[in-house]
Amino acid sequence: TEQAYLKTYQLGKKEEDWLAVKAKAGDNTRDGQQSEVLFIEQDYLFLKEGGMLAIVLPDGILTNSSMQYVRTQLEDWFRIVAVVSMPQTAFAANGAGVKSSVLFLKKWPKDHTEELESKKKSIEAKLLKDSDYIAKRDLWDREIRQKQKEKVNSLKSHDLKSATAIKKTQAYKEWNAELLAEYAAKIDDLKSKLTDSYLVRKQKELPDYPIFMAIAEE
């Protein structure tokens, strides 16, 4: 089956979210994963350490925020030697009109890849500790439950006595939606700040190297 096939690929599975309070249970397969993404991993497995690779990738993989996990894996597996942006019409003769780039990659030694992954995990752990992220999330969860309990008590009447019945009323539903939206915004803001801090720390602490960039003319 497709799921069994995808599970054989690292890029066929969802990556662990370092800002998740609890690990998600159940299947972590990326259903319908793009073949060009899996092709990157297949190339990595075929190459020897220090081996070179030229690969054509849709620009969406290089720019879309939803594809950040692919770019992260690329930088862990390969030294990016060069990126050449191709014209929109480069592969039109083959029926492909997607804007693409050619990446020239060199496979890192295994110990270098492991070192990069370890440093990233270390940065994540320090940011979580310094920001009291888990404690803040736990506190906010407790605040939500307490406010929900207080709201239920305030809505109790002769006709509405049970918490279950009160939570089904339109008044409670509208109030609760506003409450959850308020805390969701606080969580998103904290996550955004930590993500920005992670990128700054990663840029400072991980080894840097030049990448040749070019735009191919039609």
Regions picked out by a protein language model, each given a short descriptive name:
Residues 1-218:
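A conserved structural/catalytic subdomain of Rossmann-like adenosyl-cofactor enzymes
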